[in-house]
């Protein structure tokens, strides 16, 4: 297996985001692309990612290969990527994964494959009463603003085709309206709904602003929030965040 990433910096931010939730992952290289699944230790957030073969400049995968890595070590290397670096991933005969950064000079790092914990896929057959789409930078900037207010929860409320995000803390409260009319949303559909989620989990997805241009937001009353950060060539990073009992 050997692949070459087109935008190494953007690629690194997918893993920087994952590191906010989990400690180890299995990289599943298939004919369709690189698949990654994970669930955080508190079992609040389930993650499902597809980085399609077309996302890569080169994608040489003859058969499915799974490689487990410790995210901290793997991400520390990816954080050293510079704008002009080419990034290669490949496996050797022992299923170790080699990361090569080729820029002004070549740097190579080899990580032993680990046996990552098996992921039990939750039931994701969900019907979402409200769905919307926004620019990723718009959504994540708003989430960052709400984080500044403090508090540990965020309320998602859909009413009249508009999306309201709000939070409360000792510092005060904040409510932000997003709609197609004010440009906060690119599109929206569905009925009214309201649910509360842990603010930390939503904030931890915000690094996806780097590799993703648009985000799809779907939720309903007392069901998980789904954030789909769209990636080039039909890829996606899905985050399912369980609601809080309020």
From Swiss-Prot:
It comes from the Archaea. One of its GO terms (molecular function) is DNA polymerase processivity factor activity. This is DNA polymerase sliding clamp 3. Keywords: DNA replication, DNA-binding. HAMAP family: DNApol_clamp_arch. InterPro entries: DNA_clamp_sf (IPR046938), Pr_cel_nuc_antig (IPR000730), Pr_cel_nuc_antig_C (IPR022649), Pr_cel_nuc_antig_CS (IPR022659), Pr_cel_nuc_antig_N (IPR022648). Belongs to the PCNA family. Transmembrane segments: none annotated. SUPFAM superfamilies: DNA clamp. Sliding clamp subunit that acts as a moving platform for DNA processing. Responsible for tethering the catalytic subunit of DNA polymerase and other proteins to DNA during high-speed replication. Both trimeric complexes inhibit DNA ligase and both 3'-5' and 5'-3' activity of Hel308 (Hjm) helicase, but stimulate Hjc, the Holliday junction cleavage enzyme. The keyword Cell division does not apply. The subunits circularize to form a toroid; DNA passes through its center. Replication factor C (RFC) is required to load the toroid on the DNA. Forms dimeric complexes with PCNA1 and PCNA2, and trimeric complexes with PCNA123 and PCNA323; does not form homotrimers. Crystal structures show a heterotetramer of 2 PCNA2 and 2 PCNA3, which would be large enough to clamp a Holliday junction. GO terms for biological process: leading strand elongation; regulation of DNA replication. The keyword Secreted does not apply.
């Amino acid at each position: 297996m050997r692949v070459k990433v087109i935008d190494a910096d953007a690629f690194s931010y997918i893993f920087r985001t994952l590191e906010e939730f989990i400690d180890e992952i299995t990289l599943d290289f298939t004919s369709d692309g690189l698949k990654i699944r994970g669930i955080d230790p508190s079992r609040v957030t389930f993650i499902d990612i597809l980085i399609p073969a077309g996302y890569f400049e080169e994608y040489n995968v003859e058969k499915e290969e799974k490689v487990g890595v410790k995210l901290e070590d793997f991400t520390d290397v990816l954080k050293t990527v510079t704008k002009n670096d080419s990034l290669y991933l490949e496996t050797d005969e022992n299923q170790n994964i080699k990361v090569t950064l080729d820029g002004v000079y070549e740097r190579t790092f080899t990580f032993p494959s680990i046996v990552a914990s098996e992921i039990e896929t939750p039931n994701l057959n969900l019907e979402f009463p409200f769905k919307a789409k926004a620019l990723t930078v718009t959504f994540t900037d708003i989430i960052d603003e709400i984080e500044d207010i403090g508090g540990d929860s965020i309320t998602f409320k859909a009413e009249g085709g508009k999306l309201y995000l709000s939070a409360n803390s000792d510092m005060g409260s904040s409510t932000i309206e997003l709609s197609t009319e004010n440009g906060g949303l690119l599109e929206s559909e569905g009925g009214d709904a309201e649910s509360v989620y842990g603010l930390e989990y939503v904030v931890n997805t915000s690094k996806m602003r780097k590799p993703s241009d648009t985000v799809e937001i779907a939720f309903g009353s007392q069901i998980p929030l789904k954030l789909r950060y769209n990636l080039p060539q039909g890829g996606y990073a899905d985050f399912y965040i369980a609601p809080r009992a309020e």
